Amino acid sequence: MASLIQVRDLLALRSRMEAAQISQTLNTPQPMINAMLQQLESMGKAVRIQEEPDGCLSGSCKSCPEGKACLREWWALR
């Protein structure tokens, strides 16, 4: 089980990561990592970075049957 400090330190080392990557690296369930990231965000220590839909190569993200599943969400330290 990872701690909040370990999540923060990992973000400091790797500059930005997805929640799934953090979960896999720290061998911690993703819902726990999501909660920790939200806590870091509320403390003003981390920021959520979302890709813009105009970054889609095919330009069809808006009509994609998966919704916005192709848009990635990154986390970084503030």
Curated annotation (Swiss-Prot):
Top-level taxonomic group: Bacteria
Gene3D superfamilies listed in its UniProt record: Winged helix-like DNA-binding domain superfamily/Winged helix DNA-binding domain (1.10.10.10)
InterPro entries: FeoC, Tscrpt_reg_HTH_FeoC, WH-like_DNA-bd_sf, WH_DNA-bd_sf
GO MF, one annotated term: iron-sulfur cluster binding
Protein name: Probable [Fe-S]-dependent transcriptional repressor
Pfam families cross-referenced by the UniProt entry: FeoC
Encoding gene (name): feoC
Keywords: DNA-binding, Iron, Iron-sulfur, Metal-binding, Repressor, Transcription, Transcription regulation
Family label: Belongs to the FeoC family.
NCBIfam families the record matches: PRK15431.1 (NF011960)
Its biological purpose: May function as a transcriptional regulator that controls feoABC expression.
List of residues binding iron-sulfur cluster: 56, 61, 64, 70
Organism: Escherichia coli O127:H6 (strain E2348/69 / EPEC)
